[in-house]
Amino acid sequence: MYFDAIIIGAGFSGLYQLHQCRDQIGLKTLVIEEGKEVGGTWYWNKYPGSRCDTESHIYCYTFSKEIYQNWKWKERYPKQKEILSYLKYVEKKLSLKRDIIFNNRVNSAFYLDEKNLWRVKTNKNKTFYCKYLISAVGSLSTTNVPNIRGLKNFKGGWYHTGRWPNKKISFKNQKVAQIGTGSSGIQIAPVLAKSVKSLTVFQRTPNYSVPARNKKLTKTFIKNTIDKYNHIKNLLKKTPGGHGFHFSKKSIFEFTESKRLKILEKAWLNGGLSFRACFSDTTKKISANKIVSNLSLIHI
C-alpha cells in the first residue's frame, strides 16, 4: 500500500507530524505505532510516580490556540495519566486515529533507489511504500535491561519502568531492589518506599536533583496562561530547550557571595529546571558548577 508519508511513532512528535502532513499539507499519511494507543513515552512509562519534569503549561502543543485554551492542566508537573489523557484529547479533537495503525512495530525501512520510495515492513508482516519517511520514535521509549546473570531464573517478580504492566502491582511488605537513579529511578523510589518492607537502591552515578515544588494549579494561574497564549508561544521559540525561561547572561563570579546565595535560594524555593539558569556559567565552568551544586548541602 502506498502513502505519501509514513510516520513511525504516535507520541507528541508523531501526532503533530500527522496533523501537519495530512491536514496542513494534504499528504496521504500513515502513522505506525507499536503500542495499543497514542502516547509515545507516556504510554510506555506508566510506573508509579511517573510525571513530567517540565511545567504543564509549556509541555504541550501551542500550534492550536483552541486546544491550548480548552485543556485545563491540574498540576504544575503533570502525572503520566494526565499527559496521556491530554494526548488522547488532542487525537480525538483532530481525528487522528483514523490514520494510525497500532500494535505494529517497524522492523525494517529500506530505500528503493530505482523507485525513489521507502519500503517499510512491520512485525505483523505488513508492507507499505512511501515517498517521505519520518521517524518520531523519540529517545525515551527503548528499554535498557541489564544483562544480569540468573535473571531469567529469578522466581520473584521483576519489572522495568519503561515497560510497566497495565495491571496494578502491589509491593506491600516486600523486599525490593531498585537498579538505577535516573529520572525514573528518582521518581519511583519514594513511591515504593511508602509500602515496601525494605527498599535497596543500587546507584552507579548520583544525579543532582532539584526540588520540583509541585502543586495544584489555581484558577487564576490557569486563566493567566490562557490569556498569555501568544506570549508563551513566542517565548518557547526563543528560550533554550523551549522551557519558557531565559538563562542569565551574567557569570556567578560577577556577584558577591551573599548575593549568589540569595539568587540561588530564591530559585531553590521556586523549584524546577530554572534553577540551572541562575548564572551563565553553571554548566560551563567546574568552579561555577561546584558553587551552585553545594547549595544542596545547606538543605540536607
Q: PLM features: what roles do these ranges have?
A:
Residues 176-196:
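Rossmann-like NAD(P)H-binding beta-loop-alpha module
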Residues 1-5, 10-151, 167-168, 181, ...:
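N-terminal FAD-binding dinucleotide-binding subdomain shared by FAD-dependent oxidases/monooxygenases
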Residues 163-168, 188-189:
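Catalytic micro-motifs at enzyme active sites that drive phosphoryl/nucleotidyl and oxygen chemistry
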Residues 161-162, 172, 224, 300:
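Intrinsically disordered, low-complexity serine/threonine-rich segments
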Residues 117, 157-163:
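Short gly/ser/thr-rich secondary-structure transition/capping motifs
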Residues 168-176:
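Glycine-rich NAD(P)-binding loop of Rossmann-like domains
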